Every structure is written in structure tokens, then in C-alpha cells.
């Protein structure tokens, strides 16, 4: 299954989750798109609930199904902690996500583009792989030639707050994942147990 690249507002309404992080998609119409609007919510089966929760989490990070599933498999190999939370931490440690959390991009999709285009450095070296796994303490910065890119500067200015598990210097346009996040600091709207149940049946 390929990565979804269609209208994020329509997809957000379908999932009942803001994919842009602004919540504007759901402000006026918090029901699935289509002719029947609010009356179009049908009761889901157990499998349907698990699938819907998996899709919510996958679309939140903007990943294709294969990449998302492979990361889940990696999480199953971590011996400490719970599988669902370990999976979410691996998602959070992706470079594109850390760039987004630092406020260098307004969305994860935009953050992925910045990484792909070579705007981002990790410990002073250019990394253009969005899935690169960031370790706590590694310095994420903007390449010198990219420091005046309008979209980056606008994102930094528009960012009102950052998670407690990252640090950021707006003057230097650099920051770091200072520690791994706690469960209550990420995706409170997601029930990761349903995602685990879904893949336990599939793998």
C-alpha cells in the first residue's frame, strides 16, 4: 500500500483525527466526508476498530503500510517495555518526526520534504533519509545554506510550543531529542493496544 498523498483535510475527517496538527479540519465538520455527513458513522466490528486505529496512527506519521509494518516488527524485538509503546517511540524517533517536533516544519509531510531536500543536519552531517533513527542527545540543525528558507523560518515563528522531550535554540535553528518521550506525552488520542491486536493477527 502506497503512502497517502491526497487531501489531508478529507482524510482527517475520515479518521476523526487532525493530520495537520492544527485541528482546523475538524473544527466545522467533525464527521466523515460524503453526502450523508454526521449520519454516516456506522458501528464497527472488532476488526474494523483495530484497522481504524492502525490507520489513524499510520496516517498521523504519513507512512506507507510496508514501512509502518516493518517498524512494528522492529518493535517486537525490543525486550523491555510494552510493545505498543515501544512502537510509538520508534515512530517518534524518526528524523522527519523530530524535525516536526522541533518546530522546523509545520507538518510531518513538510518535515519529510525538508529532510529529502538536504536541509537537515544530524550532528553536523547532512542526512536525507526521513526514517533515520535519532538517538537522545543528537543535535538536529538546519544546513547553513538553508537557514533563510522561508518555509523553515515561518514554521519556527508559527510554533507556539514544543514537547518537553526536545530542546530548541531558535537563533541557531538547532535542537535535540533530549530524552525518549513518556506515554502521556505523545498521541493521547491513540489506543495502541488496538494496533498491537491488529498486527498480532496479521503477522
Curated annotation (Swiss-Prot):
PANTHER family linked: 30S 40S RIBOSOMAL PROTEIN (PTHR11831), SMALL RIBOSOMAL SUBUNIT PROTEIN US4M (PTHR11831:SF4)
Subunit and interaction comment: Part of the 30S ribosomal subunit. Contacts protein S5. The interaction surface between S4 and S5 is involved in control of translational fidelity.
Organism listed in the record: Streptococcus pyogenes serotype M4 (strain MGAS10750)
Pfam families: Ribosomal_S4, S4
Function: One of the primary rRNA binding proteins, it binds directly to 16S rRNA where it nucleates assembly of the body of the 30S subunit. With S5 and S12 plays an important role in translational accuracy.
One GO biological process term: translation
Protein name: Small ribosomal subunit protein uS4
Molecular function in Gene Ontology: rRNA binding; structural constituent of ribosome
Domain S4 RNA-binding: 93-156
Family per record: Belongs to the universal ribosomal protein uS4 family.
Ranges in coiled-coil conformation: none
Key words, A-Z: Ribonucleoprotein, Ribosomal protein, RNA-binding, rRNA-binding
A GO CC term attached to the entry: small ribosomal subunit
Disulfide bonds: none
Amino acid at each position: 500500500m502506497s503512502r497517502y498523498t491526497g487531501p489531508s483535510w478529507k482524510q482527517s475527517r475520515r479518521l476523526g483525527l487532525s493530520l495537520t496538527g492544527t485541528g482546523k479540519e475538524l473544527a466545522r465538520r467533525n464527521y466523515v466526508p460524503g453526502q450523508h455527513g454526521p449520519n454516516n458513522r456506522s458501528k464497527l466490528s472488532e476488526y474494523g476498530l483495530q484497522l481504524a486505529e492502525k490507520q489513524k496512527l499510520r496516517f498521523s506519521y504519513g507512512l506507507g503500510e510496508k514501512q509502518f509494518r516493518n517498524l512494528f516488527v522492529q518493535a517486537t524485538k525490543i525486550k523491555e517495555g510494552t510493545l505498543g509503546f515501544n512502537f510509538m517511540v520508534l515512530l517518534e524517533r524518526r528524523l522527519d518526526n523530530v524535525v516536526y517536533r522541533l518546530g522546523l516544519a509545520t507538518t510531518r509531510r513538510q518535515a519529510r520534504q525538508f529532510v529529502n531536500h538536504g536541509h537537515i543536519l544530524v550532528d553536523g552531517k547532512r542526512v536525507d533519509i526521513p526514517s533515520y533513527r535519532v538517538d537522545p542527545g543528537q543535535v538536529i540543525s538546519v544546513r547553513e545554506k538553508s537557514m533563510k528558507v522561508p518555509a523553515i523560518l515561518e514554521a519556527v515563528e508559527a510554533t507556539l510550543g514544543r514537547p518537553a522531550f526536545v530542546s530548541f535554540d531558535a537563533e541557531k535553528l538547532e535542537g535535540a531529542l533530549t530524552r525518549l518521550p513518556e506515554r502521556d506525552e505523545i498521541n493521547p488520542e491513540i489506543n495502541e493496544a488496538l494496533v498491537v491486536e491488529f498486527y498480532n493477527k496479521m503477522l
